[in-house]
Amino acid sequence: MRLNGDSGPGQDEPGSSGFHGGIRRFPLAAQPEIMRAAEKDDQYASFIHEACRDAFRHLFGTRIALAYQKEMKLLGQMLYYVLTTGSGQQTLGEEYCDIIQVAGPYGLSPTPARRALFILYQTAVPYIAERISTRAATQAVTFDESDEFFGDSHIHSPRMIDLPSSSQVETSTSVVSRLNDRLMRSWHRAIQRWPVVLPVAREVLQLVLRANLMLFYFEGFYYHISKRASGVRYVFIGKQLNQRPRYQILGVFLLIQLCILAAEGLRRSNLSSITSSIQQASIGSYQTSGGRGLPVLNEEGNLITSEAEKGNWSTSDSTSTEAVGKCTLCLSTRQHPTATPCGHVFCWSCIMEWCNEKQECPLCRTPNTHSSLVCLYHSDF
């Protein structure tokens, strides 16, 4: 007996199951069954994640457990999907909803390579992307503070390149050094632009996820991006009902929402371009007018020059960077500072993890909830 998931439009109906030429044709799983199975899988994976986190906390302490909470989540998800999908078995959610995975044009069971690819997309890729994003943001701050080092390396690197090459070894060394210098400068520019690119990348990712969900509501094949990338579908092997609900109307709503977001994005881009052109025109007129503006005097009556203003700004910037506090839970620089109702500030991930266990402030024990936490942007204390 062989499974066939691509049975055509007429064979996807509930009454199309049966024997035809010795082949048992099962209908494709409907959207409610796939969504229900995904919710069950997330629930059981969270159970394993909590068990791994508790074991890790008892072994190494709360501080180290908070520092490696993302790795514990990755470990829990990997264990769940490797023990189920990786071994060729149904997950608990799939077994609950009577669906199985198929792939390929003939609707056969996924190969081990395809299952491994799905597990990698489902668990490791989001973790790696988040780690790269965090590391890039940290290095962007480090590069801003060490511009002198990169300036010196940029000055000294041409001396290495301009050395006379009298042999093949010197030529290869100069080529390698030139390539290394270009890669370092490209990496430096990319890291410096990352804080600006990150919000745009997140918006694009949200649009891609919504577009995938819209396609799922229309066609009913791939609920997750990982399944679409690996080509894993579902067929229904349970008792067929007379009416299997579909979610095309939700796809229409998502399509309307995406159109509105696209129109809003175009409007914002046009407004930003118009604003930048107006600012450039005003700056140009100010520079060509020859005026230097009104003189500004300090408390002693001396004229404040541009160099003094730059010095004051640099001093204030350095003091502001030094004033950034540390989280009392992880004892490191606060990432995404979040304030509690009582006024204490922690890392977003640290205080959220704390509120999962105890809904109170770690310092003053004031009761608080997840909804009462406020993430502070463009400021820290």
From Swiss-Prot:
Induction comment: Up-regulated by hydrogen peroxide.
Q: Where, per UniProt, does this protein localize?
A: Peroxisome membrane
Q: What is its EC number?
A: 2.3.2.27
Keyword list (alphabetical) reads:
Membrane, Metal-binding, Peroxisome, Peroxisome biogenesis, Protein transport, Transferase, Transmembrane, Transmembrane helix, Transport, Ubl conjugation pathway, Zinc, Zinc-finger
Q: What happens when the gene is disrupted?
A: Embryo lethality at the heart stage.
The way it spans or sits in the membrane comes to: Multi-pass membrane protein
Q: Which domain of life is it from?
A: Eukaryota
Which body tissues produce this protein? Expressed in roots, stems, leaves, flowers and siliques.
A single GO BP: photorespiration
Q: Where are the transmembrane segments?
A: 31-60, 62-83, 113-154, 179-219, 247-266
The known regulators of its activity are described as: The E3 ubiquitin-protein ligase activity is stimulated by PEX12.
One GO cellular-component annotation of the UniProt record comes to: cytosol
Instruction: Name the reaction it catalyses.
Output: S-ubiquitinyl-[E2 ubiquitin-conjugating enzyme]-L-cysteine + [acceptor protein]-L-lysine = [E2 ubiquitin-conjugating enzyme]-L-cysteine + N(6)-ubiquitinyl-[acceptor protein]-L-lysine
Q: Please give the residue ranges for the topological domain Peroxisomal matrix.
A: 1-30, 84-112, 220-246
- Pathway noted in the entry: Protein modification; protein ubiquitination
Q: Which residues bind Zn(2+) 2?
A: C342, H344, C361, C364
User: GO MF terms on file?
Assistant: ubiquitin-protein transferase activity; zinc ion binding
Q: What class of enzyme is it?
A: transferase
Q: What does this protein do?
A: E3 ubiquitin-protein ligase component of a retrotranslocation channel required for peroxisome organization by mediating export of the PEX5 receptor from peroxisomes to the cytosol, thereby promoting PEX5 recycling. The retrotranslocation channel is composed of PEX2, PEX10 and PEX12; each subunit contributing transmembrane segments that coassemble into an open channel that specifically allows the passage of PEX5 through the peroxisomal membrane. PEX10 also regulates PEX5 recycling by acting as a E3 ubiquitin-protein ligase.
Query: Would you identify the family this protein belongs to, as annotated?
Result: Belongs to the pex2/pex10/pex12 family.
Tell me how this protein assembles: Component of the PEX2-PEX10-PEX12 retrotranslocation channel. Interacts (via C-terminus) with PEX19-1.
Q: What is this protein called?
A: Peroxisome biogenesis factor 10
Q: Which organism is it from?
A: Arabidopsis thaliana
